[in-house]
Amino acid sequence: KLCVRNVYAPTADTAIMCKEVLKDWDPETITYDHQPDVSGVYQDYCRVVKNQYSWKEFDVTSLARKWYLGENHGVQLSAPKSESSFSQLHSSETANQPYFVLEYASLAGLESYLTYDHQSAGLAGTGSVSLVNGNLIFSHADTAMNGNRLPVSVTHYYNSCDSDKDEFGMGYGWRTSLHQTLHKVLYNGEVEFVYTDGDGTEHFFKKNKNDQKKYFDQSELSLTLEVGDANITITDKGDNVMTFPLVSDTPTEDAPETGKALIQKIQDAVGNEVVVTAVADAPLKIASVTDGANRVTTLHYTDGRCDRIQTPWQDAENCVRFDYYDFYNEETLYITHEDGRMSKYEYALANGYHLLVSASAIEKHVDQQPDKKLADVTYEYSNTNAIDGLPHCITHATVTGTKNGTTLTAANVSYT
């Protein structure tokens, strides 16, 4: 937000419009007759009320995202030509100088209150491009169960915000819907808890001033965190409870984040439970999950990476399997389903981030032969020159499919 204050109270209600400046300009030489070009689109506006002094705010969120990438020419504040009165604003040389307010929130995952553009790659899954921050979340259904006693279905999630991490043995940027974690952070001198859900969204919890063992959810999802003697619980408004081990470490200025703790149990309002068991020597890797009907889904690992997920009725050759390839910084993940159908995921490495650039449903892979794609989604990113500290946002998505041997384009979308 850009915040400004008027110097004089206007004699009539006055509108102020905010526009993006399109070219560089010099504050020492700029004049009314020699101004840089500005956008024809209003970023925001406000109305200064007659005979009042007040602070006014302009929402410049979309511009701030461009500024992160280096394109910053500022904004122009002006009154519509139809206005008969005017409003004079304080400059940077006064006590009431203009200022910016930047508010940060984790928008890394999928939330119902955010807006996304979705792309289908058939069997390979669904991509979701955030229209707020350009982040990519890609989901792939691994296993499915039915029933009334908390059945367990496992979904793979790729999150481009986390694509510099391989914390769960699922590949860079990947986790499953069951890889839910809890840790502490030091923020503005206060210790807060961070719950990360199954698609990578971070939910921050701040201490309740009236109860030192309880924390409230700042994302306004009506979640309550409570620190007990043996564990930590998070309860939602439907009385569903998630249980985590105690996070005993305390973050410091030198180490502002603690290690993460994996979820142990999920319980619904009537007492049905899902129990998550971690690998003994790798506390963030899941060994097995037991649902409310005592059905056990197991995850198996080779060289630290998950190579298959088995439901109770499956064996090692007839389940969802994962194969990882890395040749000269060209990474590929193949997923093979129980029925032999396959999905393929390709990555580009940029500044330590493993960016998903293609997700495809393919015919069965044959070594030394090019894969035949049945459905495909490809992505392009900003900051491809990999400048450290700048985000990798989706700028383009293309969806194609094959019909009667012909490749057809279903969607071709640019994001700005």
Tell me what each language-model feature is.
Residues 1-108:
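Secreted, disulfide-rich extracellular signaling modules
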Residues 1-2, 18, 58, 100, ...:
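Residue-level detector of buried hydrophobic side-chain packing
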Residues 5-7, 21-23, 63, 80-82, ...:
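Solvent-exposed coil/turn segments that connect beta secondary-structure elements
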Residues 8-14, 28, 163-164, 274-275, ...:
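Short acidic, Gly/Pro-enriched loop/turn segments at secondary-structure junctions
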Residues 12-14, 54, 71, 85, ...:
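Residues that flank catalytic or metal-binding motifs in active/ligand-binding sites
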Residues 18, 99-192, 200-202, 220-226:
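Intrinsically disordered, low-complexity segments enriched in small residues
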Residues 26-30, 106-121, 285, 308, ...:
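Low-complexity, Pro/Ser/Thr- and charge-rich linker/hinge segments at domain boundaries
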Residues 154, 160, 170-174, 180-416:
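Extended charged/polar low-complexity repeat regions
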